[in-house]
Amino acid sequence: MFINYAHRGASEYAPENTMSAFDMALQLGANGIELDLQRTKDGKIVIFHDNKIDNKSNKKGKISDYTYQELLDFDFGSWFSLKYKGEKIVLFEDFAKKFLSKSLTFAIELKDEGIEKETLDIIKKYATHNNIYISSFDYKALENMRKIDSNIKLAWLIKEKINNENINKLLNDNK
Protein backbone atom coordinates (compact mmCIF):
# COMPACT_ATOMS: atom_id res chain seq x y z
CA MET A 1 0.00 0.00 0.00
CA PHE A 2 1.21 3.50 -0.84
CA ILE A 3 0.78 6.03 1.96
CA ASN A 4 0.03 9.61 0.98
CA TYR A 5 1.01 11.46 4.16
CA ALA A 6 -0.40 14.92 4.73
CA HIS A 7 2.68 16.52 6.30
CA ARG A 8 1.48 18.52 9.32
CA GLY A 9 -1.95 18.07 7.80
CA ALA A 10 -2.65 19.66 4.44
CA SER A 11 -0.10 22.35 5.25
CA GLU A 12 -0.10 23.83 1.75
CA TYR A 13 -3.82 24.59 2.08
CA ALA A 14 -4.29 25.45 5.77
CA PRO A 15 -2.06 26.43 8.71
CA GLU A 16 0.11 23.45 9.60
CA ASN A 17 -0.75 21.16 12.50
CA THR A 18 -4.21 22.70 12.99
CA MET A 19 -7.62 21.04 12.87
CA SER A 20 -8.26 22.90 9.62
CA ALA A 21 -5.15 21.32 8.09
CA PHE A 22 -6.07 17.85 9.33
CA ASP A 23 -9.67 18.15 8.10
CA MET A 24 -8.42 19.42 4.74
CA ALA A 25 -6.07 16.44 4.46
CA LEU A 26 -9.04 14.09 4.54
CA GLN A 27 -10.97 16.20 2.04
CA LEU A 28 -8.00 15.99 -0.33
CA GLY A 29 -7.81 12.20 -0.03
CA ALA A 30 -4.74 11.69 2.16
CA ASN A 31 -4.58 8.25 3.76
CA GLY A 32 -1.91 9.26 6.26
CA ILE A 33 -1.31 12.20 8.59
CA GLU A 34 2.04 13.33 10.00
CA LEU A 35 2.08 15.53 13.10
CA ASP A 36 4.41 16.75 15.83
CA LEU A 37 3.98 16.66 19.61
CA GLN A 38 5.34 18.98 22.31
CA ARG A 39 4.58 19.57 25.99
CA THR A 40 3.20 22.84 27.35
CA LYS A 41 4.33 24.54 30.57
CA ASP A 42 1.49 22.80 32.45
CA GLY A 43 2.24 19.37 30.97
CA LYS A 44 -0.39 19.14 28.22
CA ILE A 45 0.61 17.53 24.93
CA VAL A 46 -0.14 19.75 21.95
CA ILE A 47 0.50 19.51 18.24
CA PHE A 48 3.15 21.94 17.01
CA HIS A 49 6.34 21.58 14.98
CA ASP A 50 8.70 24.52 15.44
CA ASN A 51 10.88 25.24 18.47
CA LYS A 52 9.32 28.70 18.73
CA ILE A 53 5.81 29.94 18.02
CA ASP A 54 7.04 33.30 16.66
CA ASN A 55 6.38 32.60 12.95
CA LYS A 56 3.21 30.55 13.40
CA SER A 57 1.24 32.63 15.90
CA ASN A 58 0.69 36.18 17.10
CA LYS A 59 2.99 35.66 20.11
CA LYS A 60 6.64 34.83 20.76
CA GLY A 61 8.43 32.12 22.70
CA LYS A 62 8.34 28.36 23.02
CA ILE A 63 5.38 26.04 23.57
CA SER A 64 6.91 25.15 26.94
CA ASP A 65 6.82 28.83 28.00
CA TYR A 66 3.01 28.80 28.10
CA THR A 67 0.19 26.83 29.68
CA TYR A 68 -2.35 25.21 27.40
CA GLN A 69 -4.97 27.80 28.48
CA GLU A 70 -2.61 30.63 27.55
CA LEU A 71 -1.91 29.06 24.15
CA LEU A 72 -5.65 28.85 23.46
CA ASP A 73 -5.76 32.66 23.49
CA PHE A 74 -3.19 32.88 20.68
CA ASP A 75 -3.94 33.05 16.95
CA PHE A 76 -2.28 30.16 15.10
CA GLY A 77 -3.92 30.88 11.73
CA SER A 78 -3.47 34.47 10.58
CA TRP A 79 0.19 33.95 9.65
CA PHE A 80 -1.07 31.65 6.90
CA SER A 81 -4.15 33.60 5.78
CA LEU A 82 -6.72 35.90 7.39
CA LYS A 83 -9.26 33.22 6.45
CA TYR A 84 -7.81 31.22 9.36
CA LYS A 85 -7.68 34.05 11.90
CA GLY A 86 -8.30 32.69 15.38
CA GLU A 87 -7.20 29.12 14.59
CA LYS A 88 -6.37 27.37 17.87
CA ILE A 89 -3.49 25.15 18.84
CA VAL A 90 -4.57 21.49 18.92
CA LEU A 91 -4.48 19.37 22.07
CA PHE A 92 -3.23 15.90 21.06
CA GLU A 93 -6.10 14.24 22.90
CA ASP A 94 -8.63 16.27 20.86
CA PHE A 95 -6.90 15.17 17.66
CA ALA A 96 -6.87 11.56 18.87
CA LYS A 97 -10.61 11.60 19.65
CA LYS A 98 -11.40 12.86 16.18
CA PHE A 99 -8.90 11.02 13.97
CA LEU A 100 -7.27 7.94 15.53
CA SER A 101 -10.31 5.75 14.90
CA LYS A 102 -10.21 6.51 11.16
CA SER A 103 -8.64 4.12 8.64
CA LEU A 104 -5.52 6.21 8.22
CA THR A 105 -1.82 5.75 8.90
CA PHE A 106 -0.29 8.17 11.38
CA ALA A 107 3.30 9.36 11.74
CA ILE A 108 3.57 11.02 15.13
CA GLU A 109 6.84 12.79 15.87
CA LEU A 110 7.89 13.32 19.47
CA LYS A 111 9.61 16.68 19.75
CA ASP A 112 10.16 16.36 23.52
CA GLU A 113 11.52 13.52 25.61
CA GLY A 114 9.31 12.68 28.57
CA ILE A 115 5.96 12.60 26.76
CA GLU A 116 6.18 8.94 25.75
CA LYS A 117 3.84 7.38 28.33
CA GLU A 118 1.14 10.01 28.07
CA THR A 119 1.31 9.87 24.27
CA LEU A 120 0.90 6.08 24.33
CA ASP A 121 -1.94 6.29 26.85
CA ILE A 122 -3.84 8.65 24.54
CA ILE A 123 -3.14 6.47 21.49
CA LYS A 124 -4.35 3.34 23.29
CA LYS A 125 -7.47 5.15 24.47
CA TYR A 126 -8.59 6.24 20.99
CA ALA A 127 -6.86 4.19 18.28
CA THR A 128 -8.84 1.35 16.76
CA HIS A 129 -5.93 0.00 14.68
CA ASN A 130 -2.14 -0.19 14.76
CA ASN A 131 -1.27 1.97 11.75
CA ILE A 132 0.62 4.36 13.98
CA TYR A 133 4.33 5.08 13.80
CA ILE A 134 6.11 7.05 16.50
CA SER A 135 9.16 8.94 15.27
CA SER A 136 11.79 11.15 16.83
CA PHE A 137 15.27 12.52 16.29
CA ASP A 138 15.79 11.71 19.99
CA TYR A 139 16.79 8.03 20.17
CA LYS A 140 16.33 8.04 23.96
CA ALA A 141 12.65 8.96 23.52
CA LEU A 142 12.24 5.98 21.19
CA GLU A 143 14.00 3.68 23.66
CA ASN A 144 11.63 4.91 26.37
CA MET A 145 8.67 4.25 24.09
CA ARG A 146 9.91 0.70 23.38
CA LYS A 147 10.21 0.01 27.13
CA ILE A 148 6.59 1.06 27.64
CA ASP A 149 5.22 -0.87 24.65
CA SER A 150 7.35 -3.47 22.89
CA ASN A 151 4.91 -3.64 19.96
CA ILE A 152 4.76 0.04 19.04
CA LYS A 153 6.10 0.89 15.59
CA LEU A 154 9.05 3.25 15.78
CA ALA A 155 10.97 5.36 13.28
CA TRP A 156 14.29 7.01 14.11
CA LEU A 157 14.79 10.31 12.32
CA ILE A 158 18.46 10.97 11.60
CA LYS A 159 20.05 14.28 10.60
CA GLU A 160 23.63 13.11 10.36
CA LYS A 161 25.08 10.64 7.88
CA ILE A 162 24.10 7.05 8.42
CA ASN A 163 27.11 5.26 9.87
CA ASN A 164 27.87 1.76 11.13
CA GLU A 165 27.23 2.79 14.73
CA ASN A 166 23.70 3.96 13.90
CA ILE A 167 23.00 0.88 11.79
CA ASN A 168 24.26 -1.49 14.50
CA LYS A 169 22.21 0.32 17.14
CA LEU A 170 19.06 -0.11 15.08
CA LEU A 171 19.76 -3.75 14.26
CA ASN A 172 20.53 -4.64 17.88
CA ASP A 173 17.50 -2.80 19.24
CA ASN A 174 15.13 -4.42 16.76
CA LYS A 175 15.94 -8.07 17.46
Model-derived regions, located:
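Phosphate-group recognition and catalysis centered on beta-loop-alpha active-site segments
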Residues: 1-175
